[in-house]
């Protein structure tokens, strides 16, 4: 059984910055993964798996000076961005094979798009506090 909970959040100033950082990092990981897969597809190279992308774009990237900021957000958010990319790409490839209705290729996420969302799974250890707030990792207790 899968359970989904959607919450309307009312974050304060520092929490807004932490959430904006999470949105931005998830977008960057999604776009980098899409670029790697598109490069492999057009070049005829081996298709990078989600595990390979996770190692390259999340684990190793946190150790570099250029991407050290990706360590400031929960790793679950970044992993879910790669899972979303995997789902979108798998749907696209299945459509090319004819096993699904026709859909377009996954597109890069824009910084200017207002639709921003991240997912925290049960492994992210989010919880509802006794005061009714939502406790998110590396964000804090956010009013719901």
Task: Give, region by region, the residue ranges found by the protein language model.
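Nucleic-acid substrate recognition interfaces
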Residues: 1-144
